[in-house]
Amino acid sequence: MAFLKQEYKFLAIFMLVFAAIIAVLIDDNHTPDTREGVYTAVAFLFGGVISIASGYIGMMIATQGNARTTVSARNSIGDAYKVALNSGAVMGFALVSLAVLGLVLVYVGMKAWVPADLPNYILMEIIAGFGLGGSTIALFARVGGGIFTKAADVGAD
């Protein structure tokens, strides 16, 4: 968990800098009164927060599931398999549900926040910022986790 906390500190700084870049650079000339970049940056940050929460929740479920699987393996391999399968199912459903909930919240929130005359295609571009934020954090978490794992393997040798 210490690695996740340290990684998320650096990712928070990156997210803020990248959100500022998005807010400044993204603009649609067809709607001069609306700053799509600001809305997209907010959606980007929210996607990052959802991805960070997913990573943390997934790590907690995986850690507890591994411990429970190890204890169940003392009884039988079948019990251990059931516990591992249930832990994986809970983690998968929880994380996908969190992502869908985040997407719905972004859509409803942006629909209420942006001007009513904003074209739907721009709203969809704003919502794409949510996916970009989630994907960015997931990418960095995967790469950072792989580097951490490799360093731990080298340290163990």
Feature roles, as predicted:
Residues 1-157:
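Hydrophobic, small-residue-rich transmembrane alpha-helices and their short perimembrane loops
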